[in-house]
Amino acid sequence: MYPIKTPKKLIEVALPLDAINAACAYEKMPGIGAHPRGIHLWWARRPLAAARAVIFAQMVNDPGYQQGGGFKYGVNKEKAEIERERLFKIIEDLVQWENTNNEEVLSRARAEILRSWRDTCELNKAHPLAAELFNPDKLPAFHDPFAGGGALPLEAQRLGLESHASDLNPVAVTINKAMIEIPPKFAGRAPVGPAPDLRGKASQEMFSKQWQGAQGLAEDVRRYG
């Protein structure tokens, strides 16, 4: 069996736990705005902030020097500390509730995930199945066989991974369909429902608006009630 060369991930070395814990506590507060918990009550719902941070840290390689297993990777201790602090700053920004849909913050996180994946692909370019397993232009898919409230597949999708979720409970299946299956099908599309009775500037803004993500779908839900 041909070995796979896998550098240590950031989650195996260190995490900015104080920032993650604070963001998770804030997320549980009432009145913070729209949240997946509003779709349907689900016990043991995982905080979105924790899910986002953990998936990022699982996908990003730790910068520290590593050797053994037929490969060398990373930088010396001093440089690794500086690089780790940079990655921590991304996580600290990523877990903030107000940055949940902040494209600038999400883009930085996605870029780091892709960079680590390409480093891993480069280490494994001699693998007999490299063309199948290590495509540097296609991130590995995310699978959650017991997705429950859907926090993990939702955040994996937000970080640029192709998400797949399943569950034995039909309520969980419905929640995940509503969060990760249906919205991407209508991403970037304008609403199709009856337009509200608007006049003047408000009407012009409604029809000239660029609908990003699932905004058009959300507007349809509001229009139809």
PLM feature spans:
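S-adenosyl-L-methionine-dependent nucleic acid methyltransferase catalytic domains
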Residues: 1-225
